[in-house]
Each structure stands twice: as C-alpha cells, then as structure tokens.
Regions:
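Polar, enzyme-active/binding microenvironments
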Residues: 1-167
C-alpha cells in the first residue's frame, strides 16, 4: 500500500516478523503514477494498483499498474477514472467497483485489460472489497443517504446479489 497523500512510495510487509516493528516493512519500487485513495488486488509479488487521484487538484485517475515484487509497470487503463473504489481478486483476475460520486459500476481485469461487469445494487464510494473475481464481496462505504451503509453484496463473476448487512 501507499503511505502519505498521493505518494509514489511502496512498502512491503515481511510476514516472517511476528510483531509489527520498523523491521517488518521494507521499501519497494515506486508507483509510476503517484496517487492516493487507489484500489489494489493480488499479492506482494503479483499485485495490481488502479484508480485513485493525482495531485494537484485531486483529479480522478484511470491508471493501472502491476507490481512484480520489485517494480511497477503501466498497464491498460480502467474504463472509468475514479477514486475511492474497492479492489478484489488477483493480478490476472482483478475486480474494481464503486467509487467517488457514489458509483455502482464494476470492472473486471484479465491481466491485460478491463471490461465492464455487473453494477452494484447499492452505488457507493469507499466500499470494502474482498474475495475473487468470481466470488467477490463488496461491503460498507458511503451512500448519499444515510451517509454510511452496512450493505453487503456478493459478486458471482457477472452480477451482484444483496447479502446480510454488516452489523
């Protein structure tokens, strides 16, 4: 993940360290496009970073980059520029959904390009994301009214289904 606001810095967590200390994190390669509030998917050696905002002006970004454990490489852009979106899945089967301005759209990444997926039932910004491209989970976030939501949805690779809300 990134630290600070729209930095290009990457830090990697060392899972062999049993406690969180300064030695648990190591610097990795910088993003090619410095951004904040971007989404991610994948693992430490096969990650995907996409969307977010760039400075100055907090402009929404459609940039997509892949990380190989050492460096980031630019890839084909998201179809929709946005920040405050969620990510799930892997570097070769990623999922991006939601976003600022209370978006419902979902995009699927196949390792080289993004295509449109099924829309969320509840449009939201800053949702949580987990799972895979064919068994994804979207939860929480901000909606116009009320300001926060506990709504949870499950993605099957083509459409979202409402599930039990968060408590």
């Amino acid at each position: 993940g990134t630290t600070g606001s729209a930095t290009g810095a990457t830090e990697e967590f060392n899972t062999t360290t049993s406690t969180i200390t300064g030695a648990a994190w190591a610097s990795g390669g910088n993003l090619n496009t410095a951004r904040g509030i971007l989404a991610g998917a994948g693992t430490q050696t096969a990650a995907l970073g996409f969307g977010g905002y760039t400075l100055p002006g907090n402009s929404a970004s459609n940039a997509t980059e892949e990380y190989n454990g050492t460096s980031w490489s630019n890839q084909n852009n998201l179809g929709t520029s946005r920040r405050n979106l969620a990510g799930a899945g892997t570097q070769t089967a990623g999922l991006g959904f939601g976003g600022h301005a209370y978006r419902a759209n979902t995009e699927e990444y196949d390792g080289s390009s993004w295509t449109a997926g099924g829309d969320l039932n509840t449009a939201r910004k800053s949702p949580g994301g987990a799972g895979t491209q064919t068994a994804g989970l979207g939860f929480g976030g901000y909606t116009p009214s009320p300001p926060t939501t506990g709504a949870t949805e499950e993605y099957n690779g083509s459409s979202w289904t409402s599930s039990n809300s968060m408590n």
